[in-house]
C-alpha cells in the first residue's frame, strides 16, 4: 500500500525585491544553428524531494534555508507566491514568493527533481526516491516502476503533450522513457543520461538534456540522436509553459533563450553559481531561481532582468 504524508502550508507575506545588476557582457559558449556563442556554465544542479515526514511545528526562516544542496524548485500553477524547494535534507515551502521558507515534509530522501505537468499531479524523483502526488503535494505515494535499472534519477521531465510520457535520466545508465504514466520504463538512449542533471521536454517534441560532460544536448527524435546546443555544463532548465520558446538555464549564472533553446544569452552572472530555476504558470513573465550564495532571485520581465528577494 502506498505511504502518504500530510502537510500544512502558511499564510503569505508581501515580498520585497532588491535589484541585482545583470552581468555586464559575460557570454556563454552556445551553439545556435551551427554558430558558436559563448557561455560559461559550471554548476552542479541536483533536484531533491522528500519522503515520509511532516513539517508541522517547524518554524519559518527568513531567506533561503541554511541547508546543504538546493536541488529543485516548483511554482504552484494557480498561485505564483506558493513555492516548493527541494534540498538534500527535505522539502521546504514558501507562501510569500520565496521571502520565507518552512520545512515541510519528506525528510531524508535525496530526490533531485520536481515536476508538475498539469492539474494537481506532482512528481518527485531522485536518489532512491520516486513519488507522485495527486493533490498538489499534500500527500505522496511511492512509485515503483518496472524497467529502471535503479532509482538514482538525476534528470526527470514530463512530455507537455502527453502527461503519460515521462523521461528519466538514470545516473551511469542512460535516458529512459515511460509511456504509461510511470508504471514501466524502457531505454530510450544510451548516448545520454549517464551524466545528465537536467531534462526538459518541449511541445514540439524536442528533448533538452543538460549533461555534465557534453553540455546542453537536443534530440528531435525521442532520444535516438542528439546535437550539442551549449558547450558547457548546464545543470538547471526551465521551459515557459505559456511561451515554450522562452527557456532558462542555470550554471555559472542564468541564461535566457527566446528561440526554443537554439541560442542563448547570459542575463545574470553569479560567481557562486545558480541551481534550481522555474517559471510561474499563472504569470508568464515571472520566474524564480536559486543562487548557491543562499540568495533567492526573481524576474518579473520574462527572465531578462533579475532581483534578489528579501
Report residues per predicted region:
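Extracellular glycan-interacting surfaces
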Residues: 2-310
Amino acid at each position: 500500500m502506498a505511504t502518504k504524508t500530510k502537510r500544512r502550508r502558511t499564510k503569505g507575506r508581501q515580498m520585497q525585491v532588491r535589484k541585482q545588476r545583470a552581468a555586464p557582457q559575460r557570454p556563454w559558449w552556445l551553439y545556435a544553428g551551427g554558430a558558436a556563442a559563448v557561455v560559461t556554465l559550471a554548476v552542479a544542479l541536483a533536484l531533491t524531494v522528500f519522503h515520509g515526514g511532516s513539517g508541522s511545528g517547524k518554524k519559518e526562516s527568513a531567506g533561503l534555508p541554511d541547508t546543504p544542496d538546493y536541488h529543485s524548485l516548483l511554482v504552484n500553477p494557480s498561485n505564483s507566491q506558493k513555492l516548493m524547494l527541494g534540498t538534500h535534507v527535505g522539502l521546504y515551502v514558501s507562501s510569500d514568493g520565496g521571502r520565507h521558507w518552512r520545512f515541510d515534509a519528506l525528510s531524508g530522501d535525496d530526490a533531485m527533481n520536481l515536476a508538475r505537468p498539469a492539474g494537481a499531479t506532482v512528481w518527485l524523483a531522485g536518489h532512491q526516491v520516486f513519488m507522485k502526488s495527486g493533490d498538489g503535494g499534500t500527500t505522496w505515494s511511492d512509485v515503483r516502476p518496472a524497467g529502471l535499472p535503479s532509482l538514482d534519477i538525476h534528470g526527470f521531465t514530463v512530455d507537455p503533450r502527453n502527461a503519460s510520457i515521462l523521461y528519466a535520466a538514470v545516473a551511469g545508465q542512460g535516458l529512459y522513457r515511460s509511456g504509461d504514466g510511470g508504471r514501466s520504463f524502457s531505454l530510450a538512449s544510451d548516448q545520454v543520461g549517464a551524466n545528465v542533471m537536467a531534462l526538459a521536454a518541449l511541445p514540439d517534441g524536442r528533448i533538452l538534456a543538460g549533461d555534465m560532460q557534453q553540455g546542453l544536448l537536443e534530440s528531435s527524435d525521442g532520444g535516438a540522436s542528439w546535437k550539442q546546443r551549449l558547450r558547457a555544463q548546464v545543470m538547471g532548465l526551465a521551459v515557459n509553459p505559456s511561451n515554450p520558446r522562452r527557456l532558462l538555464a542555470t550554471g555559472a549564472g542564468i541564461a535566457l533563450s527566446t528561440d526554443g533553446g537554439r541560442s542563448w544569452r547570459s542575463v545574470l552572472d553569479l560567481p557562486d553559481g545558480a541551481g534550481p530555476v522555474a517559471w510561474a504558470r499563472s504569470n508568464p513573465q515571472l520566474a524564480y531561481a536559486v543562487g548557491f550564495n543562499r540568495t533567492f532571485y526573481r524576474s518579473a520581465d520574462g527572465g531578462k532582468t533579475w532581483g534578489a528577494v528579501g
